[in-house]
């Protein structure tokens, strides 16, 4: 089994590449709502006014004292890429002649939700000045959920068509690229060509950035591998290597450095996910490939808060690492043996 480990995390987003929505992420079983939100998804917060037609003011805060001596003293959370996204509506504005129900719409970021729990609270506050006299205010407590996920699927090597989650793919080992006789050693030297494997990685329910890491299992001694990523689903541009090409040893993982990836500003609902695309280039070299070899690319990731991706089915930490996998098989080339009636083939150089 071929296992290439892509670990390491780099804080900077590589070369300005930003990811857009591609394949849909796997569904999650987490139940979310405005009081139990997930990062990157818009939520409505609303309240019924009686009588209506007064003035409303919505704001969020982590303060536990809201009003002192008749004046607002809570520290309001401003809109920004690391708090509440600027797409918020009816937020921190005085809305006159308010209708009932009144509402605000906000998208929480991963950063502002980090560490929020019952003892480190977050609130959405509504202040209401009635149309005739006096005022009132009410508070919603927000207890978020970490629903950050990362999934992986195969892309068909001929045509670059994404396959369904869990669908395997296969291709033949490449044809021989070169063959020559090496006079000093009296041996044949074969180059068994290059195979390229393609994958899509989908991250969802986060803001800011995510940093993936990978394992790839199955490479054999004599093969070399280069792992690259891009946000271009056609693989025509932006390919960036995750470290240098490395030589494989049967049964030994290879390590590559991961890179932080940000979603495109055009993506406003991160529950739909964003995608990066992975190309794995295998140089077979002296490895002949006389057996079917299963290659498994697995992925993990952390969000901008260094929180790991969850298990889609349980919404908890996975039972094991690198549980999101995609499998492809390199199908064996034919075996050719010498006929004893003729004699022996020229000995070949082995890995």
Per-segment meaning from a language model:
Residues 1-351:
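Extracellular low-complexity Ser/Thr/Asn/Gly-rich intrinsically disordered segments
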